[in-house]
Each structure stands twice: as structure tokens, then as C-alpha cells.
């Protein structure tokens, strides 16, 4: 009987929506009142919560995007008092809450949960009305179901850790950028995916819920591809996550500029400094301090870039947007620099290329002066660590350069040589299947197993890191710094770790973001704050100018001093 009623109600709702939405969303009146924005924000929240919890969507029986596109014009033009009725009738039209051949719900231990989503609003009768509030609360925890056709499913990475999968989301590569429906669909998809599957909402500078009405208004005001892409980019930048990147976004790239200055840069003594010149005809030199680009202060340009490119903090931008900073849409780029204390302007021919700020290495290992070994994770070949460590066993000390990004996963294998016994090194919070917005914490261990046929490296070990150390490099440091003879040296790391998930977005774009929470073994924060070195060492402008690697020098000196004691 309930299914027949739901079917009848769905037909009735369709008629109502057709009557209230007889004009396309793109032709709706353009005056965006505060009430309209509030109504659309409510629609976003209700649709998103239902999308990730109702069996009709989780089992792939209805198209969640199609349902939203039908609702947008009706809700957009409705009086505030009507919105709750429209949403409640829509909710009832979805049918019974029946998960089919589902298994029982796993009980989650409260002390292992990290809850990010704020769903207190579903119990707010004043906000939703009594009927909608009571009915939407029936969606409760989700049993284990077949999610192959769901808006979100879960796979496992090579280490067996759960990873969020949004591959069932449609890209709409040929969308009409003037259609308010599809513009809002992109915004609502992004907002809800982060609300329920981004593990760090609690440490953002902005409240995620407060941002929603602001970006709805921005999306309604725009009419073209540029405004759509930049609105999406701007909201994603608010995640303050160095894993965030918006792929296949034409106007985000144009905002930075298509021509780049062929150099590498870093921060030293509070300045943005050239560390390497990559083209012979480039007039810049190592040690040049960047002051202006095309007549604009470089710090002002940095602030403009951070509107659309996500960084963990204002101070940690090199690894993420360093290659977007010195760019222009003019091929001839004017740079004002300071060289030897004298300011001058030079003209640089820009290149249509992107220059990575990451450190690289050609050889997987070297023997430095004093018989000190150097391990370059960026050049490690798969399966080669064992033979390399055998060659390095006779050295008087070891430097592991994790200013580089590891080319292969050596988190646990490397720890077996450096950490005596198995020890906890971090807590990983992964999304739960039963409770969208909740993450389950698991302790990760590393070190030498009792029966492992691995010789422990006994000499002093220095691990180098800096403002470019991110993600797997940070994970590796956390795994090995428990070693008795291991010292971490250099600068604070970026603070973006854990597996990356990808969210398809209308317009053919994809958004990457950190999908797991990574904490220290005692539960401390790592995201945004990064890892702190045991010994701080910073590069100097004079050192850069002279071509010195001051962090490497400090590492070698430290090992030599330890061997003298």
C-alpha cells in the first residue's frame, strides 16, 4: 500500500514541480533575494543528506542529480513557508526506506569515532517543519549494502585502507554554464561531498555551513564557464588542503596565467627567492629576491592565487602554488627583483610549461664525505630498498632526504631498518559506510617484526624535511621517526597527508582532496600544522646564492658530531 501511495505522490509532485518550474532554471528571474538563497541552502542540505543515506539512491534506483534539477526551480521560486512542504512531498515520493538484502549494521565504538558532519539541523523542527524533520530522521545508520550504483562507494588501497570512490557521479562535460540548475548542481555536489567525506572540517578557518549561502549567491550571479569554474575553485580553496586540486579547469589556469617563469623558488628569511634557473636564456640568477611581477607586488599576487588554489596556511604555499605564482598571460614578463641589495627590473620570456617546485634526484643513493650514506626516496625503484640498505649498512651515518616525494611506497619497509620493535606511529581516520560524516580511527604500527629477517641500521640517521614535504613523505617520516637513532631536521612540513579521493564535477572537472584523517599516535593534529623537526635548520639567501644545500650540510655535521661522542 505504501509503495502505491508513494508512486501516486511522485506523480502528483511531478505535476506540481512542472507547474512551478515551467521556465528553465537559466531563465529564472535574476534578482537573488536572501530568502531565495536560504531556501536553496536548505535544499542543498536536505538533498545531500538524503542522497547519501536513502536506499533509493544508494541502490541506484533513482538519479540523484535528476531529482535535484527538478527541485531547484520549484524551491528557488517558492515562498519560505512552502519550501518545507515541497521537500517533504519530494521525500515521501522516494518511497519506503528499504535497503533490500542488507546485512546488519555494525556497531561503532564511540571512542574511535571522529564526527565531522553537522547534521543537527535535521532535528530542528523550526527549520524543517515537523513532518520533514521527523521523516528524514528515519534514515538513521546505513546497513552494509551493495553500493555499486551508489553516489559514493568504498574501495581499498594496496594497504587495505578504505578509500572513498565517487566514480558514479556524472561529469556533464557539455553542460550549459548559464543554466542555474547545473551551476547549483556542481556547487551542491561539492559542498555535500566535503560535508560528509572530508575529514578536516573542524579545523578550517571558515565554518563550512556559513560558506554555503555565500557561494550560492555567487553561483546565481554568474552566467558563464569562467564564473562557474572560479566559484568552484574558490570554495574548494577554503578546504585549506594541499591535496586539493581542480583538474581540467580552463579558467583556473587562465587566472594564474599560461606563461611561466622558468625557475624554482623557495622561501628564505621571509623572502621569495630563486633557487634554480631552468633555462639558459633566463636572466634571473640564484639568490634573486622576487619583489614584483608585471608591476604588482608579489605578495598581492600570492593573495590572489590563494583565492583559487588551496594551501594549508598562508606561510606554506611553495609546494602547492609555487609553480602558479610566477605566471602571466603575457609572454614577456616583467619582474622586479633584488640582487645584491639593488632593485632592478628584468624582462623574462615566459614558457608554456609548469615547473615543479619539488626536489628531485637522479641516483637512489650516494656516499658522501665521511662515509655518510644518502638515500634519495624520489629515485627509489620498486623493490630496491633491501639491496640499497645492504650497501648502506657499512656507512657511518645515513641521511634520508624527504624534501623529495617518494617514487615508491617504502613507509613500512624503511621503518623495519630503523625502528626496533613494532610501535604505533599514527592514527588514520577513514570514512564509515554506516554513518556519512563519521570517520573511524585506526592505529597504524611500524617497525621491525620479531621474526623479520632485516638487519637494523645502528648508526645516526638524519631525516630532512622542509616546506615542500607533503603527503607520503610526511607519512614516511611519521613511520620512521620512532627509531632510537633517528633525528628529523629542517623546516616544518606542509601538513596534508592521507589517501586522495577524486570528486567528478559538472563541466568535466575533477576535484582531488584528502579523504582520510591523519593524526599523531597520541591523537595530535597534523593537517595544516604539519610535522615539526627535532632540530630546526633554515636556508639563507646567501647560502642559496652560493649554491649551498644548508640543510644537507647541517645533517652531515650532526652525524659527524654524533660519531665523535
Describe each region flagged by the PLM.
Residues 35, 50-51, 59-63, 73-76, ...:
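Cleft-lining beta-strand/loop regions that shape enzyme active-site pockets
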Residues 23-28:
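Bacterial lipoprotein signal-peptidase II cleavage site
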Residues 2-9:
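Bacterial N-terminal signal peptides that target proteins for export
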Residues 19-21:
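C-terminal motif of bacterial Sec signal peptides marking the signal peptidase cleavage site
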Residues 81-97, 101, 221-246, 306-357:
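PDZ-domain C-terminal substructure recognizer with occasional recognition of PDZ-binding tails
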Residues 56-88, 198-243:
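Amphipathic alpha-helical substructures
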Residues 46, 50-54, 72, 190, ...:
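Conserved PDZ fold ligand-binding element
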Residues 35-36, 44, 48, 112-159, ...:
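PDZ/PDZ-like domain segments forming the peptide/carboxylate-binding groove
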Amino acid at each position: 500500500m505504501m509503495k502505491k501511495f508513494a508512486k501516486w505522490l511522485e506523480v502528483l509532485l511531478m505535476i506540481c514541480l512542472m507547474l512551478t518550474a515551467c521556465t528553465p532554471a537559466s531563465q529564472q528571474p535574476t534578482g537573488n533575494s536572501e530568502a531565495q538563497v536560504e531556501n536553496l541552502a536548505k535544499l542543498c542540505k536536505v538533498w545531500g543528506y538524503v542522497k547519501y543515506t536513502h536506499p533509493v539512491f544508494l541502490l541506484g534506483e533513482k538519479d540523484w542529480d535528476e531529482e535535484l534539477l527538478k527541485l531547484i526551480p520549484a524551491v528557488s521560486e517558492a515562498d519560505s513557508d512552502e519550501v518545507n512542504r515541497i521537500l517533504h512531498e519530494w521525500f515521501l515520493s522516494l518511497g519506503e526506506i528499504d535497503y533490500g538484502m542488507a546485512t546488519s549494521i555494525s556497531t561503532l565504538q564511540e571512542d574511535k569515532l571522529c564526527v565531522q558532519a553537522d547534521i543537527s539541523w535535521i532535528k530542528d523542527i523550526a527549520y524543517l517543519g515537523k513532518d520533514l524533520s521527523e521523516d528524514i530522521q528515519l534514515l538513521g545508520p546505513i546497513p552494509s549494502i551493495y553500493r555499486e550504483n551508489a553516489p559514493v562507494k568504498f574501495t581499498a588501497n594496496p594497504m587495505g585502507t578504505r578509500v572513498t570512490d565517487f566514480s558514479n557521479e556524472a561529469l556533464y562535460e557539455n553542460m550549459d554554464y548559464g543554466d542555474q540548475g547545473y551551476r547549483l548542481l556542481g556547487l551542491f555536489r561539492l559542498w555535500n561531498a566535503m560535508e560528509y567525506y572530508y575529514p578536516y572540517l573542524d579545523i578550517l578557518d571558515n565554518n563550512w555551513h556559513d560558506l554555503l549561502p555565500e557561494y550560492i549567491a555567487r553561483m546565481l550571479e554568474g552566467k558563464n564557464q569562467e564564473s562557474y569554474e572560479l566559484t568552484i575553485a574558490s570554495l574548494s580553496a577554503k578546504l585549506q588542503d594541499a591535496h586539493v586540486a581542480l583538474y581540467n579547469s580552463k579558467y583556473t589556469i587562465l587566472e594564474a596565467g599560461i606563461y611561466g617563469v622558468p625557475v624554482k623558488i623557495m622561501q628564505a628569511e621571509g623572502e621569495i627567492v630563486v633557487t634554480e634557473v631552468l633555462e639558459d636564456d633566463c636572466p634571473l640568477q640564484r639568490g634573486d629576491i622576487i619583489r614584483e611581477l608585471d608591476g604588482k607586488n608579489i605578495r598581492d599576487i600570492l593573495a590572489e592565487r590563494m583565492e583559487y588554489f588551496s594551501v594549508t596556511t598562508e606561510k606554506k604555499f611553495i609546494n602547492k602554488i609555487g609553480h602558479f605564482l610566477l605566471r602571466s598571460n603575457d609572454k614577456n614578463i616583467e619582474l622586479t627583483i633584488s640582487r645584491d641589495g639593488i632593485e632592478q627590473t628584468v624582462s623574462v620570456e615566459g614558457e608554456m610549461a609548469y615547473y615543479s617546485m619539488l626536489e628531485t634526484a637522479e641516483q637512489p643513493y650516494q656516499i658522501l664525505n665521511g662515509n655518510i650514506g644518502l638515500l634519495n626516496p624520489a629515485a627509489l625503484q620498486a623493490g630496491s630498498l633491501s639491496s640499497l640498505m645492504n650497501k648502506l649498512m657499512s656507512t657511518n651515518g645515513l641521511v634520508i632526504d624527504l624534501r623529495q616525494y617518494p617514487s615508491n611506497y617504502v613507509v613500512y619497509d624503511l621503518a623495519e631498518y630503523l625502528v626496533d620493535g613494532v610501535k604505533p606511529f599514527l592514527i588514520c581516520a577513514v570514512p564509515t559506510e554506516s554513518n556519512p560524516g563519521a570517520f573511524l580511527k585506526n592505529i597504524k604500527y611500524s617497525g621491525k617484526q620479531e621474526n623479520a629477517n632485516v638487519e637494523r641500521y645502528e648508526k645516526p640517521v638524519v631525516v630532512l624535511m622542509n616546506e615542500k614535504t607533503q603527503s607520503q613523505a610526511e607519512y614516511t617520516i611519521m613511520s620512521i621517526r620512532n627509531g632510537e637513532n633517528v633525528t628529523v631536521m629542517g623546516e616544518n612540513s606542509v601538513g596534508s597527508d592521507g589517501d586522495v579521493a577524486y570528486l567528478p564535477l559538472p563541466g568535466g572537472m575533477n576535484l582531488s582532496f584528502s579523504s582520510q584523517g591523519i593524526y599523531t599516535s597520541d591523537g595530535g593534529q597534523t593537517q595544516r600544522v604539519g610535522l615539526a623537526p627535532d632540530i630546526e635548520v633554515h636556508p639563507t639567501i646567501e647560502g642559496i646564492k652560493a649554491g649551498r644545500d644548508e640543510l644537507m650540510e647541517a645533517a652531515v655535521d650532526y652525524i659527524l658530531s654524533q660519531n665523535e661522542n
